């Protein structure tokens, strides 16, 4: 995996000081931390054709098409993309191959986009970006540069596969890092953290880490699980929540607003609440394991299988002074 293009891209940008540490960090990752299946995933990416779409739409979805592809080529693309399963965040429509992902991430984007500052010309960080679906939508909304970070290596390969099929667009780059591995860059106009906070053992530390990536006046877009309760309530689940082990703190939206203000954010707004439905998160032919339907109480879908409130998500927007 070659990150040279990204290094060259940021060399003359406000992110240039990241080059003091990042190349050595990623070289160490490639030497010491590769997943056992990484070579197989990387090979699938390598075998994919580098295509220049005749039609490309990142504004209303992530779709690309070309009249030049034969049915055999299309089938070959689908086979290689299926080698990168499971596909969790999407959907993608690529030359007649429709990747029906576990999550309808476009629905989340539709809930978020009306409430945030215009991304036109902005440098954006997407923390916990998955395979990068929202990164492409951020470009579609006018972002100048989008950097995604996610330590899951399958997501990196899925992202690079998409890049090959979307015309080798170099305005978006995914790095296999967690937020705690970033220096205090203070260089991003907008930082997104969507579906991450409840996985963090120390949520206030996470909020400070996000703040440290923003320029003064920059905007945080935070999307996470919440509970329907007063401003002082926080759920601390037992061993599992909706069958997930690594869930630590689920505050009410009001409590989360208080946390953001305690961390020094201003103009904190709760802009959306939405229950996750089994239409938004479900098993598909591109993600064949259990999904939300199996994680809810079969007799009472307002509760998880463990008896906690079913997943409710909120979007908050805040500003770094």
UniProtKB/Swiss-Prot annotation:
Subunit structure, interactors included: Homotetramer.
Organism: Erwinia tasmaniensis (strain DSM 17950 / CFBP 7177 / CIP 109463 / NCPPB 4357 / Et1/99)
GO molecular function, one term: transferase activity, transferring alkyl or aryl (other than methyl) groups
Amino-acid positions noted as binding carboxy-S-adenosyl-L-methionine in the UniProt annotation, renumbered to this chain: 89, 103, 108, 128, 179-180, 194, 198, 313
Reaction catalysis annotation: carboxy-S-adenosyl-L-methionine + 5-hydroxyuridine(34) in tRNA = 5-carboxymethoxyuridine(34) in tRNA + S-adenosyl-L-homocysteine + H(+)
EC supergroup of this enzyme: transferase
EC numbers, comma separated: 2.5.1.-
Protein name, per record: tRNA U34 carboxymethyltransferase
Pfam families linked to this entry: Methyltransf_9
Swiss-Prot/TrEMBL keywords: Transferase, tRNA processing
Similarity annotation: Belongs to the class I-like SAM-binding methyltransferase superfamily. CmoB family.
GO BP annotations listed: tRNA wobble uridine modification
């Amino acid at each position: 995996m070659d990150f040279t293009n990204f290094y060259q891209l940021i060399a003359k940008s406000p992110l240039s000081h990241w080059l003091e540490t990042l190349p050595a960090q990623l070289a160490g990752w490639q030497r010491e931390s590769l997943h056992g299946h990484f070579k197989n995933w990387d090979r699938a990416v390598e075998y994919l054709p580098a295509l220049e779409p005749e039609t490309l739409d990142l504004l209303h979805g992530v779709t690309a098409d070309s009249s030049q592809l034969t049915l055999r080529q299309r089938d070959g693309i689908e086979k290689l993309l299926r080698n990168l399963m499971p596909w969790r965040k999407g959907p993608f429509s690529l030359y007649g191959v429709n990747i029906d992902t576990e999550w309808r991430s476009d629905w989340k984007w539709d809930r978020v986009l009306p409430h945030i500052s215009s991304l036109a010309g902005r440098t954006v960080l997407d923390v916990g970006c998955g395979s990068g679906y929202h990164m492409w939508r951020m470009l579609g909304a006018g972002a100048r540069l989008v950097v995604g970070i996610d330590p899951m290596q399958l997501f990196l390969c899925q992202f690079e596969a998409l890049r090959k099929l979307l015309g080798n667009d170099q305005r978006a780059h995914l790095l296999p890092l967690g937020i705690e591995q970033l220096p205090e860059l203070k260089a991003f106009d907008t930082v997104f953290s969507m579906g991450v906070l409840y996985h963090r053992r120390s949520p206030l530390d996470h909020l400070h880490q996000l703040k440290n990536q923003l320029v003064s006046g920059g905007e945080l877009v935070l999307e996470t699980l919440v509970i329907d309760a007063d401003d002082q309530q926080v759920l601390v689940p037992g061993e599992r929540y909706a069958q997930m082990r690594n869930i630590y703190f689920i505050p009410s939206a009001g409590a989360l607003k208080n946390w953001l203000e305690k961390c020094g954010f201003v103009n904190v707004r709760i802009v959306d609440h939405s229950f996750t439905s089994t239409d938004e998160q479900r098993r598909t032919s591109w993600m064949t394991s259990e999904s939300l339907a199996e994680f809810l109480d079969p007799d009472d879908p307002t509760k998880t299988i463990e008896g906690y409130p079913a997943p409710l998500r909120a979007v908050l927007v805040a500003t770094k002074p």
